[in-house]
């Protein structure tokens, strides 16, 4: 787990060093820079900050040079690198024990397509001197971030957007802002800045340094036709396969040359991962948060689960002052707007656990892949009602008097799933509480709306959509929350094989009347943990953002979310009505603080944060 940077622009060495310093928390163990002279006399610079996990020897520091012709910067882990060495590289002499060198050797043997064999979370770029090209890729589910700026014959990339921003005059992207107001995140391929894009999950690229041509390709998608599995013939067959895949995913993710632990909230997903980990090693410690607000403290549930598994557990005390400190650090570490304040306690728990371990396993991805959100149940019922009206429309279409009536009706049915999703308020990321934003420009179609239009997928289309969009939010949160304290989080449920197989499972395997949401995961877990320890409503911890905005941060809220700032910086919103909403909230009206957190963080990060040169101070 690291931070990567590269550019064809001619910066002074001090500028490159400052850029790397902006993300040194991602990799405090080593900082490296390589200045490369290309065959046509141009300059290419690679930079890397390393968090040492595999092969701690300095020989594996980056930028890494392989056989003189290949240089690489790499963030993440290729979990199956030992299997790849055995299967493909038996005749290759390697000088390290790192997965970094395996990526290089696999590229030399198989080319760009070698990425299709990697099981992991990664973002990497290779420079091939022989061809004078850069090739790069991002993992299938987008666990690791990758930002880039392509202009003319220049390409610059980094793990975080502020690294590209430093020393450059970038402009805010209005389309990204509109998506942020709707979703609470900036979806791929957008970034806060118009010039900067994200490589999307499952994409790879080739950049020709001589011509400046950038060719981006998709090497993996959620399309079930491309996966290596067949649909199960029974529920028992499906459960056994999911269990086997999860066990193997955990096995791969336990490999490290540094201390490893597990997050354990006491919920279904984290308990499942902790239970599987205990089958491999009962000595690995579990970590949970103990909040001083008893209304939200669930540490006793986690302790009960750990005791039933016979694993050690450490309750990390988290106070209101601790949370406030993390919030004050927001601008430094979370350099892209993110409207979910749960990232604050997530960051704090990671910080506490980092005192003992460098790598930690978590249960992220279970809700998106195995129907863990109540909206799936709501949407199923609503869709059934909606589709009944569709057949009525189709029946009466021949009797429409106006020209084009049939085409109009049939066109409308192509958007059934999107319409139902929108009617349930899923596009407007809880932007209201007791009130609603009065004006949000929907503008352009969302990038991944095509997944909702897939009629053959039925209700599963919603899960496909969440996997391509809201999983971005999960990935961004855990990446920033853990890298803030130089910790690597691994998510076995997000193994691409688990994701592929989950796409083949019918709705009733995911949700049923008795077990409710995430049926198949619960069935697997109940084989290892008593059901009575787990059957309870899911609450989650809500940081006291509302109290902060009404108390010690009240003036800061007024100064930041001001009428002028709303008018000039968030023009999609009605400034008069929003200010009235803000004042009513501060005076005690029951309104969701998330509305103001959304606006506050956007303005802070993009307009009131330090200038690029101040970042390096």
Please place each PLM-identified region on the residue numbering:
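Short acidic/histidine-rich active-site segments
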Residues: 357-367, 371-373
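Single conserved hydrophobic/aromatic residue that forms the stacking wall/gate
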Residues: 607-617
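Glycine-rich, phosphate-binding/catalytic loops in enzymes
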Residues: 64, 154, 376-380, 617
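Adenosyl-5′-phosphate
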Residues: 1, 113, 166, 195-201, ...
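A mobile, often basic/glycine-rich helix-loop segment
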Residues: 370-394
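Conserved glycosyltransferase catalytic-site signature
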Residues: 99-100, 119-121, 271, 299, ...
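Cysteine-centered catalytic environments shared across enzyme families
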Residues: 1-334, 346, 350, 527, ...
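Short, flexible loop segments at the rims of nucleotide/cofactor-binding pockets, characterized by
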Residues: 335-340
């Amino acid at each position: 787990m690291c931070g990567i940077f590269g550019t064809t622009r001619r910066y002074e060495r001090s500028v490159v060093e400052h850029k790397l310093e902006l993300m040194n928390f991602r990799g405090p163990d080593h900082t490296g820079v390589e200045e490369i002279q290309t065959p046509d006399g141009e300059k290419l610079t690679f930079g890397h900050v390393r968090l040492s996990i595999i092969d701690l020897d300095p020989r594996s520091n980056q930028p890494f040079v392989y056989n003189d012709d290949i240089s690489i910067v790499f963030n993440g882990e290729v979990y199956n690198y030992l299997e790849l060495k055995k299967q493909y590289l038996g005749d290759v002499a390697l000088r390290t024990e790192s997965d970094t060198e395996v990526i290089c050797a696999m590229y030399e043997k198989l080319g760009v397509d070698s990425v299709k064999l990697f099981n992991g979370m990664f973002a990497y770029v290779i420079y091939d001197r022989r061809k004078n090209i850069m090739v790069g890729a991002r993992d299938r589910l987008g666990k690791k971030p990758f930002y880039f700026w392509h202009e003319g014959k220049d390409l610059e990339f980094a793990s975080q957007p502020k690294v590209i921003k430093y020393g450059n005059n970038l402009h805010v992207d209005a389309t990204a802002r509109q998506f942020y107001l709707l979703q609470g995140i900036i979806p791929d391929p957008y970034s806060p800045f118009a010039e900067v894009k994200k490589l999307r999950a499952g994409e790879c690229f080739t950049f020709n340094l001589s011509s400046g041509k950038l060719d981006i390709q998709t090497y993996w998608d959620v399309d079930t036709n491309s996966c290596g599995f067949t649909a199960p013939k029974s529920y028992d067959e499906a459960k056994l396969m999911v269990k086997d895949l999860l066990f193997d995913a955990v096995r791969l993710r336990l490999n490290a040359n540094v201390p490893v632990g597990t997050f354990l909230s006491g919920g279904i997903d984290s308990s499942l991962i902790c239970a599987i980990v205990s089958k491999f090693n009962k000595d690995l410690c579990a970590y949970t948060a103990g909040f001083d607000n008893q209304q939200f403290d669930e540490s006793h549930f986690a302790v009960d689960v750990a005791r039933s598994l016979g694993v050690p557990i450490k309750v990390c005390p988290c106070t209101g002052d601790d949370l406030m400190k993390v919030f004050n650090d927001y601008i430094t570490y979370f350099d892209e707007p993110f409207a979910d304040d749960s990232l604050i306690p997530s960051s704090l728990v990671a910080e506490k656990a980092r005192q003992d371990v460098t790598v930690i396993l978590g249960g992220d991805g279970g809700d998106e892949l195995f129907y863990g959100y109540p909206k799936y149940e709501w949407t199923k019922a609503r869709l059934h009602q909606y589709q009944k009206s569709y057949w009525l429309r189709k029946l009466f279409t021949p009797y429409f008097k106006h020209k084009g009536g049939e085409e109009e009706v049939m066109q409308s049915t192509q958007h059934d799933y999107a319409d139902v999703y929108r009617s349930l308020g899923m596009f407007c990321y809880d932007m209201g509480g007791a009130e609603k934003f009065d004006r949000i420009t929907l503008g352009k179609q969302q990038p991944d709306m095509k997944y909702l239009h897939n009629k053959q997928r039925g209700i599963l289309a919603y899960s496909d959509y969440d996997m391509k969009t809201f999983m971005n939010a999960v990935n961004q949160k855990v990446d920033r929350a853990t890298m803030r304290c130089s910790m690597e989080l691994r998510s076995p449920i997000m193994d691409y094989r688990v994701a592929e197989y989950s796409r083949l499972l019918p709705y009733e395997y995911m949700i049923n009347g008795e077990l409710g949401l995430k049926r198949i995961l619960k069935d697997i877990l109940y084989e290892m943990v008593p059901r009575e320890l787990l059957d309870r409503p899911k609450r989650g911890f809500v940081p006291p953002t509302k109290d902060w905005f009404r108390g010690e941060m009240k003036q800061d809220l007024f100064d930041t979310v001001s009428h002028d700032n709303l008018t000039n910086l968030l023009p999609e919103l009605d400034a008069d009505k929003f200010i009235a909403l803000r004042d009513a909230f501060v005076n005690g009206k029951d309104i969701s603080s998330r509305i103001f957190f959304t606006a506050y963080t956007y303005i802070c990060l993009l307009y009131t944060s330090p200038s690029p040169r101040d970042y390096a101070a």
